Amino acid sequence: MKHLLGEEYEDYLKCYEEPRHYGLRVNTNKISVEDFLKIAPWPLRPVPWISNGFYYDGDQIQPAKHPYYFAGLYYLQEPSAMTPADRLLIEPGDRVLDVCAAPGGKATELGAKLQGKGVLMANDISNSRAKGLLKNIELFGIGNKIGRASCRERG
């Protein structure tokens, strides 16, 4: 790694000493950001580059055990992982393909951007991971989807 990063190697090592960033992304298919902030059961801080992304204190709370999580009001996702789907210019009516889609972080955001129009095809090579992907897509209320797991062997 030192060879690859060169003079940035020391900064790379320092990042492991920093506290972890916990994030969640509001499902705008089910609730507006404004309405979610009114009912949020814990303090949230905005992720500056993601309009529906927020930081939370993961050392103090467990949002994966809250009823809002099971209602599909938000998706737990590291803030930097929110960026790719956010930056794609997806419009309602588009046809979108997400390969290596499990567990569904990008797919749920892409599906929300479609606003019930167009089609989202989410694919993963692993059947077990595809089950989690489909669960998350269902939780998010994405109706215009095609889920698929490839059964082809790698190697």
Kindly give the residue locations of the regions a language model identified.
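S-adenosylmethionine
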Residues: 1-154
